[in-house]
Amino acid sequence: AVKSAAFANGMPDTSSWKPGVDYVRADTGDDFPDAFDAVVMIEKAVVREDGSVTFDDDVTVEPGSGVRPAGSTLRAGEPLMSAGSIIRPTDLAALAMGGATMVPVRVKPRVAFIPTGSELVPAGIKPRRGQNVDTNSLMCKHLLIEYGAEPVVFPLVHDDPVELERAFEAALATADVVVVNGGSALGEEDFNVKLIERRGQVVHHYIAAVPGRPLMLAVADGKPVVDLPGPTMAAYFGSEWCLQAITARILGIPLRRRPVVQARADAAKTSIPKMANIARVHVTRDDEGYAAHFLDFKAGELAACMTSNAQRVSPLGEAGWAEGDLLDVELLRGEEFVDQG
């Protein structure tokens, strides 16, 4: 750090300069006496053993150059963040700069997830004939975490009305939102619908979306209740449009938007115009741009659907598309994960 006045008439004679008198050493972020009002990068200077200094010929010094005065990082009264913002690591740094070590935040909604079905076994248990692995608890738990909720996953509940009611009441007592998974249709053992109809007020049952049409929305004890269909893709779609929206509403944040690209359809496909249709897609990239291979969860491609890198939700009124049509698809892993060729 130097005194800019010494450079008023160009490069001064520095052969007799002394540290602490004509200049001081200062690392990035250091404070130094106010008399030294400019900084020259050390890469542009040579400090001799006797303390004198020489500067590169191209050094120019103006008052305040290289110096950040006190208060320049943040001005008194300047807003740091807006309400409803999600606090990122960089936001924490800005808050600390302003001395805000404690800020009010919205509490993450506790979402109870009750998996139901006598045919289900926990993940990690080899299923016998007639049994299915409970994959939805794992999937929906981490979807809810992505959405900003605090999931509370209950143990598996058999298709037993008494056992189901016990779990449902426990969930209502401890959570802000209750999700019952399975039993949302009108089958012989679909007890969930009857329980929710008796215990709460049904807002809507059967929606214009496939897969997942039997989804039910209700309110019980003033809390949102969702009966999420059991099939994996149906549970996923219901989580995406319904559970995510409920969580965002409670948190007061907008719905997230994934990156969207236009991709060529590799085959013609029909959809139900009266329904929103979700399709999982594998997107690749070639010399002509993006290509979309649509997967069919009903044709033995369920695992591939779950690990695909994109998806598309067909809007209401769309009857399908032809091979080669350019379609908007959502990237689920980011553009950097799209395969080449």
Features from the language model and the residues they span:
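Solvent-exposed alpha-helices and their adjacent loops that cap or buttress functional pockets
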Residues: 10, 15-18, 32-34, 46-48, ...
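Flexible glycine/proline-rich
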Residues: 74, 197-341
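Short beta-strand segments
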Residues: 25-27, 56, 82, 113-116, ...
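Phosphate-interaction motifs
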Residues: 1-101
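Short Gly/Thr/Asp-enriched flexible loops that form oxyanion-binding sites at enzyme active sites
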Residues: 187-199
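Phosphate-binding glycine-rich loops and their immediate beta-loop-alpha structural context
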Residues: 66-180
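Short glycine-rich anion-binding loops that position phosphate/pyrophosphate groups of nucleotides
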Residues: 29-30, 118-119, 183-186, 231-232
